[in-house]
Design a protein with these regions (language model features):
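Catalytic cores of carbohydrate-active enzymes across secretory and cytosolic contexts
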Residues: 1-422
């Protein structure tokens, strides 16, 4: 496995498993297949020797401060991320960032070439490493190489804006198989590369979760949480990275309209800090926190805000309690490759209680047909879905639960690996 990050974070005295959808999805796959993981440790200017963690051999790639600024914050997240999410904010095109992106991709490819066994299968993950397959193909032609893009792939017209589009497509042309979350993403890719013998095979492989790893909150913990927020008539929940693609502000404004209608509801909004040195992310946080304060000022009372906002990460156990306690889960991104939060929430409601409000532009909407779909660009659409979710039919949640249970992360990985080996 080759990914931008190793599946661990540095803590005092050692390492702990990282939060996040990619890590949650891939770690069980590697353990089951005795694989290894090549990636950055998360520590800047700190060379780390290979080590074993939780049954997985990890091979760290060192990044310095300039790598982090230009490769990660720059080209990956200020150029590719906004471009691939339909220009919600304008991408920045910087030649120095591009050179750094290429240099870091070369480093990842070399590290992988050194540790991969003869004839091994290498699975490269996501937009930060799109050059690795082509570089690795030159270094190790014996390898079988797959690539999976976890975020959307843009339309040809948008992609052609990128000054280095030919180099990125050349990197993906080194693959035996390129995987996408949605058929629409694969169609966009095929429109660029064509269907001749020189282009890689491609397919659609919607990622999922490991339902067995989701920690459902106990009835006692759920009751305690609901009591702590005033036992509202309806408890709604948002769980997101603090990212401009997630539509958090528009969700808050729709919730404000719901309160104006006199609905007895409380919202818990968890917003994990993300990419805080990038201006668009800082501005998103400012707007969200301003809205939280204003809405609480209008509708809250002493000791009982209507929005409980936390700008921090939470443990799996805490998150499971939030999921289990929520009557309505709000997942309203402007654009999202999949969104595993939606599936984690469903996995916490096997008995049919709860309801899911889901953006039609999230990849999860392709599978979770029984969610209350909304257009996150239209406040009235979010509000309408919220209203409908307050009177949900339990059968809708049961059907979604069966879908998540039947198509878990192990099946996702097995299908991709079976196809790449074909």
């Amino acid at each position: 496995m080759v990914a931008n990050r190793l599946p661990v974070d540095r803590v005092e005295g050692g390492w702990k498993a990282s939060p996040g959808g990619l890590v949650a999805a891939l770690a069980p796959v590697l353990r089951a297949r005795a694989g290894c993981w090549v990636g950055w440790s998360g520590a800047v200017d700190e060379p780390v020797a290979p080590f074993r963690f939780d049954g997985i051999d990890l091979y760290p790639v060192t990044l310095d401060a300039q790598d982090y600024e230009e490769f990660y914050e720059g080209f990956s997240n200020s150029t590719l991320w906004p471009l691939y999410h339909d220009l919600i904010v304008a991408p920045q095109y910087n030649e120095q960032w591009w050179q750094r992106y290429r240099d870091v991709n070369v480093r990842f490819a070399r590290a992988t070439a050194e540790v991969a066994a003869q004839g091994a299968t290498v699975w490269v993950q996501d937009y930060q490493l799109q050059l690795v397959p082509g570089l690795l193909r030159e270094m190790r032609p014996d390898l079988t190489i797959g690539f999976f893009l976890h975020i959307p792939f843009p339309s040809p017209d948008l992609f052609r804006q990128l000054p280095w589009r030919e180099e990125l497509i050349g990197g993906l042309n080194g693959c035996d198989l390129v995987g996408f979350q949605r058929e629409a993403d694969e169609r966009n890719f095929r429109a660029l590369v064509g269907d001749d013998n020189n282009s890689p095979r491609s397919g659609t492989f919607p990622i999922s979760i490991d339902p067995a790893a989701v920690q459902v909150g106990s009835p006692e913990a759920v009751a305690k949480l609901r009591e702590s927020v005033g036992n509202p008539g309806a408890l709604m929940l948002g769980v997101d990275r603090m990212d401009y693609t997630k539509g958090i502000l528009q969700r808050l404004l729709a919730f404000e309209q719901l309160l104006e209608e006199g609905v007895d509801a409380t919202l818990i909004q968890l917003a994990t800090p993300s990419r805080e040195r990038i201006e668009h992310y800082r501005e998103t946080r400012r707007q969200v926190e301003e809205a939280v304060g204003r809405i609480n000022g209008r509708f809250g009372s002493v000791g009982r805000p209507v929005i409980h906002y936390m700008h921090r990460g939470v443990s799996k156990q805490e998150l499971g309690t939030f999921y289990a306690a929520a009557d309505v889960m709000l997942v309203t991104p402007f654009k999202d490759g999949m969104n595993l939060v939606a599936k984690e929430y469903v996995a916490c409601h096997p008995d049919g209680d709860g309801a899911l409000v889901l953006s039609e532009f999230a990849g999860a909407a392709v599978e979770l047909h029984d969610a209350y779909l909304c257009n996150p660009f239209e406040g009235a659409s979010i509000l309408r879905a919220m209203r409908e979710a307050l009177d949900s039919d339990p059968e809708r949640m049961r059907r979604m639960y069966a879908r998540v249970l039947g198509h878990d992360v192990h099946r996702w990985a097995a299908e991709f690996l079976q196809e790449v080996a074909r």
